[in-house]
Regions:
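Conserved acidic residues
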Residues: 1-2, 20
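Rossmann-like AdoMet/SAM-dependent catalytic core
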Residues: 2-13, 49-144
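A short alpha/beta connector and helix-capping loop motif
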Residues: 15, 27-64
């Protein structure tokens, strides 16, 4: 059963999408119709294999997925999963697994700024025995 088929049975109006599907999120998100994507006011997804952005195929796949999401939604929070160590390439630190929260742009007035302290203290390590993975500064957009 596809997400499109599931949504056919949902009541009219906004939906929330939460996904942790072990790397299949890219295929699912690029296959969604524009109308269904716009129905999701909130989207929470754990993206896998983010360290593959350094390969040509990985970059093209991820770029297409994120460009599509960012047309209609804004990133409001990112939580690195500390289960796997970050990968360092070209001076960039990339946690291979990160949970992103998106909010549909037409649902709030200022899509250019979400205070980072709005969720401070709400994140917990996915693996308590391992040290946390900080989100590198380059992944955080500062409001002007």
């Amino acid at each position: 059963m596809t997400l499109e088929q599931l949504a056919e049975h949902a009541p009219a109006g906004d939906l929330i999408l939460q996904m942790d599907i072990e790397g299949a999120e890219y295929r699912v998100l690029t296959s969604l119709s524009d109308s269904l994507l716009r129905r999701f006011r909130i989207i929470v997804i754990e993206f896998h294999e983010l360290d593959q952005m350094f390969s040509r195929f990985g970059h093209l796949t991820m770029r297409g997925t994120f460009d599509r999401l960012l047309d209609t939604h804004a990133v409001v929070h990112i939580h690195p999963n500390n289960n796997t160590p970050a990968v360092e390439r070209h001076g960039l630190s990339v946690p291979p697994l990160m949970e992103f929260t998106f909010y549909r742009r037409d649902s709030f007035e200022r899509a250019d700024h979400i205070p980072q302290d709005a969720v401070q203290g709400l994140d917990f390590n996915c693996v308590p025995e391992k040290p946390p993975l900080p989100l590198p500064e380059c992944w955080i957009q500062k409001a002007a």
